[in-house]
Amino acid sequence: MDEHISINVFMHYNKPMKNIIDYIKEYGNLTLEEYPFNNVDSLILSQISYIKFENSSIDIESEVHLLSEFENEIDTLCIDTRVPELNEELFIQFIHSLRYEAITISHLQTNFDKDNEKQFCAMTFHLPNQTDYIAFRGTDASFVGWKEDFNLCFQENIPSQISALNYVNNYQTKRNLILGGHSKGANLALYAGIHTHNPISCIYNHDGPGFLTPYQTDIKVYKTIPQSSVIGLLLEETTNYQIIQS
């Protein structure tokens, strides 16, 4: 059963927060040991997965690199993202914070297939607390990406779901494994987590649509839905969630 947790975790600090950049500015000096990984950290990684690392000269398909190595070309990698200047600012704040500076990235996999209406991207973030976080990118600005979103409403499976499952099944680690994503990326994380044979610690679902067929899982699922959500309520099989301000 899903455990829907509001991103109003900010209220625990008794201070108003505007966005995830503010969160890093305020709490980036706390390590993951001092304050454990939470759904805001997951949302940040999910947003960073939209950055077009596949356009970099640095190989993260077969190699492991610190995220800080991308600083000199981050403006270029953010050009094709929504609100490039905010993604760039988020990334700069991220890599220069004590909380995230040691995080590395690898296992980048992308697949854009117009004929099969498939837009897929996944990557793995290696956290210093013996945890690997697999992030699935959500819908991009392409027609194919939006068409694949539409297909979720009437198809039992879409090509990206199969790719997500294969990605997780083929991933080998002795560390704790977390899956997460935003929008369609959250749906992919949930699909892969439910069907994989690999042990999963938990899944973070940030405004992701559900499935045509209701599912059951013993894996802890944290779901966040903003007030203005449309995608996150599609095919939602339960009303047990909290709305967050957006």
Task: Give short role names for the model-derived ranges.
Residues 4:
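Cationic, low-complexity basic patches in intrinsically disordered or flexible, solvent-exposed regions
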Residues 7, 12-13:
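Short, positively charged and aromatic/hydrophobic N-terminal segments
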Residues 16-40, 45-57, 63-132, 136-176, ...:
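Alpha/beta hydrolase fold serine-hydrolase catalytic domain that processes acyl esters and thioesters
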Residues 189-195:
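Short glycine-enriched nucleophile-adjacent loop
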Residues 175-178, 191:
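Catalytic cysteine-centered active loop of the rhodanese-like fold, especially the PTP/DSP P-loop
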Residues 1:
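Catalytic center-proximal scaffold of phosphoryl-transfer enzymes
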Residues 181-185, 189:
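Gly/Ala-rich beta-loop-alpha elbow adjacent to hydrolase catalytic centers
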